[in-house]
Regions:
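The two-metal-ion catalytic cores of nucleic-acid processing enzymes
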Residues: 1-188
Length: 188
């Protein structure tokens, strides 16, 4: 199955794939004719980088259960090349405690505050419109078709027809009175 989508949103999820819990990203979008679709991407490990960590800190990181892998990298940081450590973890939720611990140790971190679904988009250099190829995936309870993507490639930009629902409630913070409730739907 092949589909070209205007990307609208993304979210990460943990799933059991080949007997192991792995993080995947679902990309949500619309085709040029207005059909909503979701795409499950191949698994990718969440990661961040530590600038010039001491050897004892590297050993402590590598011994932690939540760390999947580490590797040395040379990166341009603050105007010069520096030794860095790329740290891959098993789940996006493991980044925050590690980040906080490493910052408390006064280490400099890179890419440790990017939500994982955005990290996936940046790492794969995805634009606003992308063509996906893969097999249809049965997702119980989902209201749109889902593709289990095997390939992704940039696509020519297009504007997908969107239906926008806007809802607003204006109220008083003092006495909890509602001043105005508005709802509008726009088909585009």
């Amino acid at each position: 199955m092949r589909a070209t989508l205007r990307l609208l949103n993304a979210a990460s999820d943990d799933e059991v794939i080949d007997g192991r819990r792995q993080t995947v990203v679902y990309l949500f979008g619309r085709t040029a004719n207005g059909e909503s679709m979701a795409v499950r991407t191949p698994p990718q490990a969440p990661w961040f980088q530590v600038v010039e960590p001491p050897a004892e800190m590297v050993a402590q990181l590598e011994a932690r259960d939540e760390v999947r892998a580490t590797r040395s990298e040379r990166l341009w940081v603050n105007g010069e090349e520096r030794d860095c450590l790329r740290v891959e973890v098993w789940h996006p939720g493991k980044v925050v405690p590690l980040r906080d611990w490493l910052r408390a140790c006064e280490l400099t971190l890179l890419a440790a505050d990017i939500p994982f679904h955005f990290r996936y988009i940046y790492d794969h250099d995805l634009g606003g419109c992308v063509t996906f190829e893969g097999e249809p995936l049965e997702k119980r309870g989902w209201s749109c078709p889902v593709i289990d993507a095997t390939t992704m490639e940039p696509a020519e930009t297009f504007t997908a027809p969107l239906r926008v629902l806007s809802f607003d409630v204006e109220n008083s913070l003092v006495d909890r009175r509602i001043f105005c409730t508005c709802l509008t739907v726009h088909d585009g």
